[in-house]
Amino acid sequence: MELSPNNSTDQSLLDAQLELWHTTFAFMKSMALKSAIHLRIADAIHLHGGAASLSQILSKVHLHPSRVSSLRRLMRVLTTTNVFGTQPLGGGSDDDSEPVYTLTPVSRLLIGSQSSQLAQTPLAAMVLDPTIVSPFSELGAWFQHELPDPCIFKHTHGRGIWELTKDDATFDALVNDGLASDSQLIVDVAIKQSAEVFQGISSLVDVGGGIGAAAQAISKAFPHVKCSVLDLAHVVAKAPTHTDVQFIAGDMFESIPPADAVLLKSVLHDWDHDDCVKILKNCKKAIPPREAGGKVIIINMVVGAGPSDMKHKEMQAIFDVYIMFINGMERDEQEWSKIFSEAGYSDYRIIPVLGVRSIIEVYP
């Protein structure tokens, strides 16, 4: 029974509680997604042609017999959050027929784990790993106290994320695979949407490019461009060998190999203002003048750029707080402009074609 108009105050209280609950329990969306990834439910549905009943999913996933009834409840969360779709099985009423679960654009990104070029399973697995998630339980205390190190991750784990990747092979693989999966998707879109960014150059160095996913995508699309990756020695040691991409061990704070263009994909948001200026000054030393085609290509968020709907705005705001776990930050155009100016660059161009992220061309 609905509340009467005289009880509008009560309804307002219930509406407020609903909003509070929606945010409080939002972590269950992430945990449901993590479970779906662990069980490889998207693969199970894909193996049945993109639509599968619960019993068909059960035939493909490894599930303890006592958990069968709980899977239906998990799928209810995953369908209401649009990870999967649902439709009634033909031949019965909507009330008594077993639902058929279908793939959505979201769950298609979860097919194939690391075997699919555009699969985002490794990235989601990285972000939802306890090592990444646990520092945020300290976020409130972080705001109240001046800690010995401003990095929440280091405060929680005793060392920074890049130190941990160097010492923990399992975590290192998790991070490398996660970042590589994001690079494969976003650079693929960048090439299709703004191919002109990569035209007119004969060489490119991907600074902090990890195991080379972005550089390999660019090399494949533009075979005439000689691509290389600069990263720390322990990262380069695990890079693929059968590729046209050259891997160079080094430190971007010391020097960057010469090239027509430098790519910084999801790098600068890890660093504070002064460090960004240092990195970009080294980039400027590595590239020729603008007249000769020299430029820096940045793939990162520009807060306020791109689509203006609430989902995009919310994601930019959320990611800005997320990146605080390594003392990073997202920046608006004014903040980017100040960094470019201090690093000695003459001009820049923002190309907002990557959803919540943008391509920024920066010219010496």
From Swiss-Prot:
S-adenosyl-L-methionine binds at G208, D231, D251, M252, K265. Its EC number is 2.1.1.-. Keywords: Methyltransferase, S-adenosyl-L-methionine, Transferase. Accumulates preferentially in the roots and is located predominantly in the region of the endodermis, low levels are seen in the leaves, stems and other shoot organs. The active site is at H269 (proton acceptor). The keyword S-adenosyl-L-methionine applies. SUPFAM superfamilies: S-adenosyl-L-methionine-dependent methyltransferases, Winged helix' DNA-binding domain. GO terms for molecular function: O-methyltransferase activity; protein dimerization activity; S-adenosylmethionine-dependent methyltransferase activity. It comes from the Eukaryota. It is an enzyme of class 2 (transferase). Belongs to the class I-like SAM-binding methyltransferase superfamily. Cation-independent O-methyltransferase family. COMT subfamily. May be involved in the O-methylation of suberin phenylpropanoid precursors. This is O-methyltransferase ZRP4. It comes from Zea mays. The lineage of its organism: Eukaryota, Viridiplantae, Streptophyta, Embryophyta, Tracheophyta.
